[in-house]
Amino acid sequence: MSSQSHWLTAEERTQVLLDLKASGWSESGERDAIYKEFNFKNFNQAFGFMTRVALQAENMNHHPEWFNVYSKVQITLISHDCGGLTKRDVKLAQFIDKAAASV
């Protein structure tokens, strides 16, 4: 398992959560995960965004939990194999934010 799949240190966790919250992510109240909702102009934009994220997720072998209705995409990130938030989630969240900004 790569070092990116490992738990965050307490200091890393504090800093990355501040950064992620500043960009609209929130902590899941029920699990050690992060969540964000994205709204696009239409279904085509939402699906294009999801396609970009899916390709990156497959490349990382780290797949989001997500839900899509028309122009809305809801994403939860958690490392199931580790039982919580890891560096992989942070890296994918950062990619997701960049992908959403480019739509």
Swiss-Prot record:
Domain of life: Eukaryota
Reactions catalysed according to its record: (4aS,6R)-4a-hydroxy-L-erythro-5,6,7,8-tetrahydrobiopterin = (6R)-L-erythro-6,7-dihydrobiopterin + H2O
Entry-linked PANTHER family: PTERIN-4-ALPHA-CARBINOLAMINE DEHYDRATASE (PTHR12599), PTERIN-4-ALPHA-CARBINOLAMINE DEHYDRATASE 2 (PTHR12599:SF15)
Expression sites (tissue/organ): Highest level found in the kidney, liver, heart and ovarian follicles.
GO process annotations (BP): tetrahydrobiopterin biosynthetic process
Family designation: Belongs to the pterin-4-alpha-carbinolamine dehydratase family.
Pfam families, per the entry: Pterin_4a
Top-tier EC class: lyase
HAMAP family: Pterin_4_alpha
Repeat as UniProt keyword: no
EC numbers, comma separated: 4.2.1.96
Protein name: Pterin-4-alpha-carbinolamine dehydratase 2
Signal peptide coordinates: none
CDD domains: PCD_DCoH_subfamily_b
Task of the protein: Involved in tetrahydrobiopterin biosynthesis. Seems to both prevent the formation of 7-pterins and accelerate the formation of quinonoid-BH2.
Molecular functions (GO terms): 4-alpha-hydroxytetrahydrobiopterin dehydratase activity
Keywords for the protein's UniProt record, in alphabetical order: Lyase, Tetrahydrobiopterin biosynthesis
